[in-house]
Structure formats: structure tokens, C-alpha cells
């Protein structure tokens, strides 16, 4: 048969489809049903092809498969406990396909079943097989090796070899994207002067990046940092950066930024700053401290993801550092691990809702619905009701933590060369949750697909959002971006002025911040110290659909008429300018 039943639970679920080119799977989009959640053991993988898998904890459980036995054929599926599945048209369609295949009949006579498909899963472009082989160098035992298993943080013998980094043009060849999409390079080192950690765009469509050298263990005193904000501009309309201007320097770990009234609000280590250029030379000459006193004992547990909200507040995320920032010397409420918002002038700040983990991800839909992501198996979060509504009820405790809405935390990399400390095979460091709020991509993406970065898996997952009455669920049936280059580490994806997704590739062989592996020391930023951690490489990519980039657009010195007409622009970034 191919395996033996071991145990089961129950639930409503849908499977992950596999082998789309198999005769049984052509034209089959899957379905959702209540059923028993079978787990098998004693697997016989000889001559077996798995067609469906179901998420089971940290693993993907084979669910439907075919195999050959002598001259015979076997079709097996774990679906089918009772009438809830047997009465499902999707199951009936799958069963007919399986029976016809096992009987060596023509499966193409079975009608396509796509009615229950949440998203037409795209075919992925293959990575070419004739590329130059990766080169490896001696790392001297400086690469930690955590072994997969039920026990957390188990280390094996350290790796002694590591892959050499690739040049930007060569790295592009190692990326897989959906069919009809293409990855294009906008900027890379040496035009970027450090590790790109955040990005946004101004009213002229120019890319602004925060670049860091001080992260993770070298947070500097105020005014003594080595980090910058840089403007990267395309002056000739080819969608490649050809002009670079340093807007601000002497910063330290500038983790996020957004625009307000001709200036930029920047989270600079322990301070939230407002920086502005007043004389037109694209160099900041005015500075105001909006908030001070943010805790940054752990540099990957701070503030991130400034998003200008529909309510004219700045929305953001606070990591697991417990902070109570000050406004004009007065201490505000203390909070950690969750969504917060503040008025751009710093007059008010409000903690919105707790997540269940350290967090670096927020995304706003076109309606202003709020989503996010966290570390440790929680790549997709929905924020339904702010704490302030619960606080109006006397005696109501508001320690309500938001869990995952995703059907699984597991991801789907294109390489086995993945190094993770925990939650092996899944999102342990999910970052961002940017909804596709433009119209260059196919219609099924519009305002219902979010892009979540998985740097340890070298990928950006696409999460399809589904409203369920007053709640949401999400599933990630494919990747927007996936690389087999061990240095590739996407940390931020946002929708750019051209209506395409732009990706920051941190491009670092070492992604892990903490805990500190055996044999290593903990640095001042609570990240383990290693000379292998890169300080100079970083790339900005655009994921373009059918070469649709649009024409460069600008609202600089825009007339009232242009501003009003821009409210109908298909890209939300421009509507919010």
C-alpha cells in the first residue's frame, strides 16, 4: 500500500498539492473538508509518488499517493472518513482520477476541478542546471550546526566549510519565481554602503534605504553611529539605481522609516527621530527627537515596520524588548511584542495588541485591515480588535495574545542547504506581511496575497488571505521568491512605485541572532559573535510580472488636480502619498 496507519486526530483542513504534472493532478485544485487527520508510519517509498501532503506539526505528512507493484498500480488517499468528505465534489473528482489511473484508464476525461481553489497555484521557474558550481571556503569550524529534532537547540559538529558569496548578477540566476515573473536587480554593493535593513519611497518615487554596519552587536552612542539613510535614484527610467545620495549619517541601527510633511521619521536605535532637508540638497539639516528611551538591549527585539496608516497615525511593531519610551521627558506606557501606533508629531502613542512572539512584520490592506507576522512558527497574524475596546469593560484583562492564522508554519525552500536553530523546515524568523496593493500582478493577487520573508529558508512566501466571517485564515501555496544560494536572506518585501514587489536581500551567510551557540560569545546586542557575519553586502530586487514596470511617476510639486487624480492610482503607495 505504501504505509501503515499509526494515529489520527480530527479537523477541517486542505492539503498541499504536489506533482502538478502527474496525470491525476492535472486540472485538480484540491479542496477543504473535515476529516480525520491520519498519521502513517512504516512508509514504503519504493516506486511511490506523493500527490498531496498535510501539515502535521513540524512535518508534512504524505496524504495521497500512487505507487506501482509489479504490473499493478496502487492509488491511496487518507481522505474519506464520512459523508462530509464523500459528499465533497472535490473528493469525488480526486477519487475518479485515482480509480481511472489505477485501472490504466484515461484520466484526462475527468473534468477539471478548480472550484475550491483559493488561489491558482502558479508553476515556478526552474533554476538552471548549467550554472557555475558553488565554491566553498574553509570556515574553520565557525558555522554552528543545529540538528533537527523534537529537542530544542541540539548542536552537532560545527561546519568547517561555507559557500562563497556570489556576485549580484550571478546570484540572480539562482532565484526561482512564479512563471511569467522575473527578478531584476535595482541596486547592490558597492552602491549600497552597508547592510540594507529597511526601505521606503518618497513622493518622487525614489527609493530610500536604511543601511547598517552597527547591527547586531555594535549599537553606538547617539550621534556616533556608522549607519546611514541613503537615497537611491533611477534618473534614466531603466529601473536601475544610477544616483546615490547620503541623506543622513552617524545613525546607529536605523531599523525603519516613513515619510511625513517633507521629512522622514526614522527609528534610530533607542530614539525615534524626525529628519528633514530644508535647503533642497537631499541632506538632512533638521532633526527632532519624537520619542526617546526605547530599550534595545537585544538589537533584534526593537521597533520595526513603520507604516503610514489610513487613520494618519504611524503603525509599527515592537519586538520583545519591554519599552516605555518618553515624550518630552515623560515616560509612556510599557509594552513589548506587538502592534502599536503613534501620531507623527509624537503627541500620542498607543499599544494596540500583543502578538505571541518577537515580531518584525506588519501589513495594511487597502481597507486598512491590519496583519502581521512574528518569529517562531507564526508567519501570519490578523489583528481584529485593539486593546482599548477591551479596556472599556471594567475588570476585563487585556493580556490577549494573537496567534497564527496560517494553516502551517512550514515553508517550501528550493534547496536542502538550510541552517536553522529551531523550528526546522519552517518560519522561525518570519518578517513583514506586505499585502499586494497594486494592479500590475494578476487579479488573484490584488489585496488578498501577502508576502512574508523567510530569511533562513532563502525565500519570500506568498500567503493567500481568506476572510472567515469576522476572522481571517491564510495559506501559503507557493513562493514569490526562492533561492538556492545559501547567502540569500530576504528580510523585507514591499510594493514599490512601479506596482511590483521589491525585496531586500540581507545577503548574509549568518542569519541567526541568538541564542549563542556552544563555543561562541554573546555580543552587546545579544547576538552571538562571529567573524563570518557579513557587514558589506546587500541587494535590492524587483519581482516584475511580464516586464510590467510602468512609467516613472512623481508627485513633486504636484498640482491640486494631480493630487486628486492620484487618489485613483492603482498602486496604494501613490494613493497614500
Task: For the regions a language model picked out, list residue spans one by one.
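Catalytic beta-strand/loop cores that center a nucleophilic Ser/Cys/Thr
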Residues: 2-72, 78
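Generic recognition of short, well-ordered alpha-helical interface segments
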Residues: 19, 23-26, 93, 428, ...
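Non-catalytic, well-ordered alpha-helical segments in soluble enzyme domains
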Residues: 21-29, 92-104, 365, 434-439
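Sec/Tat-exported extracytoplasmic proteins
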Residues: 28, 102-106, 464, 544-547
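Extracellular ligand-binding/catalytic regions of CAZymes and related secreted enzymes
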Residues: 58-60, 68-147
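Beta-propeller domains with acidic blade repeats across secreted/periplasmic ectodomains
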Residues: 121-568, 574-577
Amino acid at each position: 500500500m505504501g504505509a501503515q496507519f499509526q494515529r489520527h486526530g480530527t479537523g477541517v483542513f486542505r492539503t498541499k498539492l504536489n506533482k502538478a504534472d502527474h496525470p491525476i493532478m492535472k486540472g485538480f485544485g484540491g479542496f477543504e473538508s473535515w476529516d480525520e487527520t491520519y498519521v502513517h508510519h512504516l512508509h514504503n517509498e519504493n516506486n511511490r509518488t506523493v500527490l498531496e501532503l498535510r501539515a502535521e506539526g513540524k512535518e508534512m505528512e504524505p496524504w495521497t499517493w500512487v505507487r506501482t507493484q509489479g504490473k499493478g498500480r496502487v492509488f491511496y488517499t487518507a481522505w474519506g472518513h464520512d459523508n462530509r468528505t464523500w459528499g465533497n465534489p472535490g473528493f469525488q473528482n480526486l477519487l475518479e482520477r485515482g480509480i481511472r489511473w489505477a485501472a490504466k484508464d484515461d484520466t484526462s476525461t475527468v473534468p477539471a476541478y478548480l472550484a475550491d481553489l483559493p488561489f491558482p497555484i502558479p508553476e515556478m521557474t526552474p533554476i538552471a542546471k548549467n550554472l557555475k558550481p558553488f565554491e566553498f571556503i574553509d570556515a574553520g569550524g565557525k558555522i554552528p550546526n543545529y540538528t533537527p529534532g523534537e529537542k530544542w537547540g541540539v548542536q552537532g559538529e560545527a561546519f568547517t566549510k561555507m559557500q562563497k558569496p556570489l556576485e549580484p548578477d550571478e546570484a540572480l540566476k539562482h532565484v526561482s519565481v512564479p512563471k511569467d515573473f522575473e527578478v531584476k536587480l535595482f541596486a547592490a554593493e558597492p552602491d549600497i554602503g552597508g547592510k540594507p535593513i529597511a526601505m521606503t519611497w518618497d513622493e518622487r518615487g525614489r527609493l530610500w534605504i536604511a543601511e547598517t554596519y552597527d547591527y547586531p552587536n555594535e549599537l553606538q552612542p547617539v550621534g556616533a553611529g556608522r549607519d546611514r539613510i541613503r537615497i537611491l535614484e533611477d534618473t534614466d527610467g531603466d529601473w536601475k539605481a544610477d544616483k546615490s545620495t547620503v541623506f543622513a549619517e552617524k545613525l546607529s541601527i536605523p531599523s525603519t522609516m516613513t515619510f511625513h510633511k517633507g521629512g522622514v521619521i526614522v527609528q534610530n536605535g533607542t530614539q525615534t527621530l524626525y529628519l528633514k532637508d530644508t535647503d533642497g540638497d537631499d541632506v538632512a539639516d533638521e532633526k527632532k527627537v519624537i520619542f526617546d528611551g526605547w530599550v534595545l538591549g537585544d538589537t533584534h527585539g526593537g521597533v520595526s515596520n513603520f507604516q503610514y496608516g489610513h487613520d494618519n497615525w504611524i503603525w509599527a511593531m515592537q519586538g520583545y524588548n519591554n519599552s516605555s519610551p518618553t515624550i518630552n521627558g515623560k515616560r509612556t506606557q510599557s509594552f513589548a511584542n506587538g502592534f502599536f501606533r503613534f501620531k507623527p508629531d509624537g503627541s500620542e502613542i498607543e499599544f494596540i495588541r500583543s502578538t505571541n512572539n518577537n515580531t518584525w512584520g506588519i501589513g495594511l490592506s487597502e481597507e486598512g485591515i491590519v496583519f502581521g507576522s512574528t518569529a517562531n512558527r507564526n508567519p501570519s497574524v490578523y489583528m481584529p480588535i485593539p486593546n482599548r475596546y477591551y479596556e472599556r469593560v471594567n475588570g476585563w484583562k487585556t493580556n490577549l495574545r494573537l496567534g497564527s492564522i496560517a494553516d502551517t508554519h512550514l515553508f517550501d525552500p528550493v534547496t536542502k542547504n538550510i541552517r536553522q536553530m529551531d523550528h526546522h523546515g519552517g518560519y522561525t524568523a518570519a518578517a513583514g506581511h506586505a499585502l499586494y496593493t497594486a494592479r500590475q500582478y494578476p487579479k488573484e493577487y490584488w489585496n488578498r496575497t501577502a508576502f512574508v520573508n523567510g530569511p533562513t529558508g532563502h525565500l519570500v512566501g506568498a500567503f493567500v488571505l481568506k476572510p472567515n466571517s469576522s476572522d481571517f485564515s491564510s495559506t501559503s501555496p507557493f513562493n514569490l521568491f526562492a533561492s538556492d544560494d545559501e547567502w540569500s536572506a530576504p528580510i523585507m518585501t514591499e510594493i514599490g512605485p512601479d506596482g511590483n514587489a521589491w525585496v531586500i536581500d540581507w545577503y548574509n551567510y549568518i542569519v541567526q541572532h541568538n541564542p549563542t551557540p556552544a563555543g561562541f560569545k554573546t555580543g552587546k546586542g545579544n547576538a552571538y559573535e562571529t567573524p563570518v557575519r557579513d557587514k558589506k553586502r546587500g541587494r535590492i530586487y524587483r519581482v516584475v510580472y511580464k516586464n510590467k514596470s510602468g512609467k516613472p511617476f512623481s508627485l513633486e510639486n504636484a498640482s491640486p488636480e494631480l493630487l486628486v487624480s492620484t487618489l485613483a492610482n492603482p498602486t496604494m503607495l501613490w494613493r497614500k502619498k
